């Protein structure tokens, strides 16, 4: 009997992973069992793909993004040598469908495969496989439910649930709004709750809500929308989100705590933040700070973001509602100088954010920046051509030989070595023992009991060692973890299975005002 094997490619297998790769189990859920039984799941951050396990008649599905396309193409080659039919999907394949075909894939899936996957399998079985399939953007009510029964829960720190797809923003460095659209698509409440209960029953006590923007329709976002129809839709989305929070509170697991990604604008919506903490049990969120300067925010088309002191106040307000912030601050934007990078490092410390990351600016396929920089690169030798960007892309299709420890773009005034040095110093400073202890003595972490403070300190050190370039999918990691990160990860997995809320607690208003004054 033919097999369906789904592979999440990576450079290094380390035996376990932080977050479950949702796409694997969603496509497993979209795979009809009558075709080939249960699909076989291969998550390469946990275990490497073995080509000997596939042969003629088998179908291998490979999901790639830009960061893991090279190991993905390695899986394509290995599976093809064994006579298997290989189908490639994912964000990178959506943007560049011709590239996987050039690398040997039999077919490519653009967009979401939740609905179209069954048709693709039937075509492959009948020998009529097309080169390109377009799954489009699947409506929220038709999104496939993940097959968590195929998951080895002992290999992961957190489960993964998607509640909304798409993002109404159009940041120039981000491809989400290009590939997933700017109209939020809401997953069915009953499926979200069912998956949460299933993951909790499997032993998980922490879950990652894998939404690119968990808060697409806050008061502030709605207020700045100029299109009447879009504004009305966002108002409906906000009400629907609050209904989800209510239903999740009543029917979801009471000891499953969440992390997600959202915008700083959620600080404008107290009702939303209170519900996220108390009803969704949200305990942490990545916030795209991007830059503490107005010019830096203009560089990334995110001028609606709070800036400077207002961003510090937004972070403090979010944390006052019990949601720890992971502030993501990009280094190497067009307007950056060595001086602004040093200021960025200082501001991260005084902002009071629980966690911070300092990724270097990179230009990803599908983004507005990428298309503009490629145009600049192709016209660089033409007389009288005025480039759109002072930052220059190093070469076309850099990801095929680009090492993610290097810089993919050339900054107009800062050498690549200096950029990497400043980024490393930012990481080292923020996650130094001195600064970690300082955060446990003042601000929201000071309210934690001693055991939770110790857990927070260990979490800081583990995070810095696991994600030295910023939080990303585990399949982007280039090498195996060292012994200390491995031991720390194992300890964290044991602790994270306990019915204990390690998060910060909502704080009194006078405490928040005192913290904001300190930041000022």
Locate the predicted segments by residue:
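Structural recognition of alpha->loop->beta junctions
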Residues: 99-119, 276-284, 343-358
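Short, hinge-like loop/turn segments at secondary-structure boundaries
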Residues: 58, 103-107, 126-128, 225-227, ...
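Flexible glycine/acidic-rich beta-alpha junction loops that bind and position SAM and/or redox cofactors
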Residues: 14, 97-99, 169, 206, ...
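Conserved beta-strand positions
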Residues: 6, 62, 209-211, 287, ...
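Radical SAM [4Fe-4S] cluster-binding motif and immediate context
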Residues: 144-326, 331-333, 337-346
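Alpha-helical elements of Rossmann-like donor-binding domains used by nucleotide-donor carbohydrate transfer enzymes
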Residues: 26, 74, 116-119, 123, ...
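Acidic, low-complexity intrinsically disordered segments
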Residues: 1-206
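Radical SAM enzyme core and accessory elements
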Residues: 2-9, 36-38, 53-55, 101, ...
